[in-house]
């Protein structure tokens, strides 16, 4: 039990304090990528817990049931029964919903009556628990009996400490419409105290299975993440017990025309053939009238984005290992005619929580989206968008080069902990991208090598013809001069070190002589950017010295953000945090103008 103060409420449940409730609140992922196999931190732990359960029950093909008979549950005698399989059946009518338990202590519930009540009060609740933090009548799950063609189901929250849907609290006295695959949590804690279920709409599942969905072969369990037009659920292969991430793409929400549906399937067919040690693999594909299902390799390390927020910045050797993997996987895609076009830390996954072994996801499907959907996805994370995406009206006008721009931005963030173009909320943010207006402010970049700065300057280049290709990036001295150290990282993670890259001839040899040279020759933002070239570096150095004292306050603010970086932050608050850090660049630009 948590050491925080508790109090007993009128209904007999133990009420947690506001501080404790905040600690219980799991992370909410604001946006998911179109083919990501990532999990939220809460989803990772759930997947890990369930993995142990699955291994113990591989001989039992009914993976969505738990056979533990020592359940801390009692049922009312008149409307429920327990079957030998470990399933609790409530009611005697048509099976319309299931609650698949995510904790082996509790069984799966089959709902055969219009409503059930969960809580602690025996004789009142259909499904009871003994935990003191559960209310007498905690929540009610019910469907609208007047709708016959489909299920319209709700959860009423009648609890003191909260009922949660996909890690979001409903609120006492409120109700919410639930959909197939929602996670309903009575106690959202991790581990043995967790009381959570996946709601399975039996009508929807049966319909999808009859149309060729994966339900015949896989048990679809908890939601690992949701987004604008897709969700990811943990899938357990019934025959083997192996776990996968099943990406469910809603074709209607993706605004699929007939032509684009064909394009989507063409892209998927190409992606199923992609095989690379740093790219999420697609095991198989299912399609129904409503959804496209991608069965993906499951990784448990979360997103690189979360690692950036927690670690703030990385040593150059670590960055080099991360970028070497990223660039090698992008080179593989480009050599096979595939442009990722949405590279960002949210789409770069970690194979395990304690390593930097990368797995990139969400590649190749952007061409199947309509223009509005694609731009909506891009604008959700504008820090990584190449200028040609903002200036060209048709996506056919750009391709592989946008990946190199994104790699440059990612490299910048990994090395210093904040993005190059400032806060996206500022009015001139997109103009900075279009004009390549960024800098290497002191003191944050003082200890970072000129080689790293040179690579970034050749990647974040507005002129596409002058921007590095992926082969040129891999042949840059920042990589080639430090291969022995990078190989040690590869050996530690048991990865095959990539072969040498073939250099392109049409782009200039990288210049590593000065970190203070003009960043973007074609820049239109001279009033924001340094008005210096290699011939007046002394002037530039004086400006940097003047800025050092002024930047102390910014450093203190950044440290305060570090101290407040808790594990319970939501995805949106983490993005706001990264935006706050980006003000370092905004303040630096203003100071340069004054100087």
UniProtKB/Swiss-Prot annotation:
Domain FHA: 116-170
Chain spans, region Disordered: 1-84, 494-595
Polar residues bias spans: 32-49, 508-520
Biased composition range(s): Basic and acidic residues: 585-595
UniProt key word Transferase: yes
Positions carrying Phosphothreonine: 377
Enzyme class: transferase
Residues reported to bind ATP: 224-232, 247
Segments forming domain Protein kinase: 218-479
EC number from the UniProt entry: 2.7.11.1
PROSITE patterns: FHA_DOMAIN, PROTEIN_KINASE_ATP, PROTEIN_KINASE_DOM, PROTEIN_KINASE_ST
UniProt-recorded name of the protein: Probable serine/threonine-protein kinase fhkC
InterPro entries: FHA_dom (IPR000253), Kinase-like_dom_sf (IPR011009), Prot_kinase_dom (IPR000719), Protein_kinase_ATP_BS (IPR017441), Ser/Thr_kinase_AS (IPR008271), SMAD_FHA_dom_sf (IPR008984)
A single cellular component GO annotation: nucleus
